[in-house]
């Protein structure tokens, strides 16, 4: 979900840079992987790659489709964008319902809220690099799929 100008702090970015950043998150929230064509370069680097993800813009599109199959009501709300020319940091929250398999975990029907922190490099109005960190451990706890710790399994 693109942020509303009156609710999100955005600093240091040109209008074109801000649009590219917002478009990346809209691809997920609107269920439209083709929005990546407007947001990221063809050789965009998503760091780290997710399991099974191929590099580049085209490598992310199947991941978005799989993500939307697992979480069809996904919404990403951008809370803050902090930028300098050519760089942006994003603090966001992702919400949804676990309706399909993800990370090998069968659907639970439980809703979740996950923090997202990402850093982007931008050139010529498109993202060239994204370093991302999502709270997947918190997601597992929220859906009731807490991993078994080594100490628990040994006892």
Please give the residue ranges for each predicted region:
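C-terminal and inter-domain tail/linker signature
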Residues: 1-155
